[in-house]
Amino acid sequence: MAWIQLRIHTHRDNADLLGDLLMDQGSLSITYEDGQDEPIFEPKLGETPLWQDTVMIALFDAGTDLAPTIEFLESMPFLGKGFNHKIEQVEDKDWIREWMDSFHPIQFGSRLWICPSWREIPDPTAVNVILDPGLAFGTGTHPTTALCLEWLDSLDLSNQEVIDFGCGSGILAIAAIKLGAKKVTGVDIDYQAIDASKANAERNDVVDKLALYLPEDQPANLQADVLVANILAGPLKELAPLIAEKVKIGGKLALSGLLQEQAQEVSDFYSQWFIMDPVSNKEDWSRLTGIRK
């Protein structure tokens, strides 16, 4: 089945109303895009911010006559006659197959590979983590996850205890186990992340070495030789004393989820507890590492 999509440029203040109007006109779905390459940083809890110049994309059945819809929208004062829009035909595809074809095994460092379950493992002798994209958790494609995976690959984790602080999919925790860690503890505020981490650990046959906790359930005095936290700059600063006390003296720390312009400030803050290394960057993102004093 083919589709028609109507693309409309609008101000974010009008997005909710326009979305309702489009649904009333028979749109099957509404999606949003950035109209002017405007970054959005760290939304507050419960917020779903939009770009100032937002492109709204309304999907309709291929047989829909959009002329009445355009005429109706032109009567809206916030749009007006000749408003900025475009009508496009969308080719019918096997979208699930298209989506699956877009994911390939990725190598991180010298030993580690992250592989979707439907792909052939490139190097059976390497350290392979089987992980499928799903939910809103890391699969290695984002620069911050890649920075953390590369760092873990560079370490000798033999007989080390590791904490994955903000474990998400469990990708970092599972990689640490596969790279030799004797025990890994994953902590996350989202019970869905705990469930995702457990499912991925079971798929990789490492569930016996992984303990998973919500913050309120984690053991008292939890400490490790290595801690990795791929979250955001705000929580990293707010939780710095807690994170620091979880790393043994002489232990190793990696922090990511930071934009390059945020990295130095966070590094300076953590220098109270850690001997910090130079910042490592990938695209617009940074990773901080250090040794516990």
Swiss-Prot record:
Which cellular component, as a GO term, is one annotated location?
cytosol
Q: Which superkingdom does the taxonomy of this entry point to?
A: Bacteria
Q: What is its main location?
A: cytoplasm
Q: Which reaction does it catalyse?
A: L-lysyl-[protein] + 3 S-adenosyl-L-methionine = N(6),N(6),N(6)-trimethyl-L-lysyl-[protein] + 3 S-adenosyl-L-homocysteine + 3 H(+)
**Record keywords:** Cytoplasm, Methyltransferase, S-adenosyl-L-methionine, Transferase
Key word S-adenosyl-L-methionine present in the record?
yes
| GO BP annotations listed | methylation
Segments traversing the membrane = none
**What Pfam families does the database record attribute to this sequence?**
PrmA (PF06325)
Query: Quick one: which residues bind S-adenosyl-L-methionine?
Result: 145, 166, 188, 230
Q: GO: which molecular function terms?
A: protein-lysine N-methyltransferase activity
Keyword Cytoplasm among record annotations: yes
Give the E.C. number(s): 2.1.1.-
Q: Where in the cell is it found?
A: Cytoplasm
Q: What does this protein do?
A: Methylates ribosomal protein L11.
PANTHER family this protein is in?
Answer: ELECTRON TRANSFER FLAVOPROTEIN BETA SUBUNIT LYSINE METHYLTRANSFERASE
Q: Which NCBIfam families match?
A: prmA
Give the family from UniProt: Belongs to the methyltransferase superfamily. PrmA family.
Under HAMAP family, the record lists: Methyltr_PrmA (MF_00735)
Instruction: Spell out the protein name for this chain.
Output: Ribosomal protein L11 methyltransferase
Give the organism the record lists. Answer: Shewanella frigidimarina (strain NCIMB 400)
Classification of source organism: Bacteria, Pseudomonadati, Pseudomonadota, Gammaproteobacteria, Alteromonadales
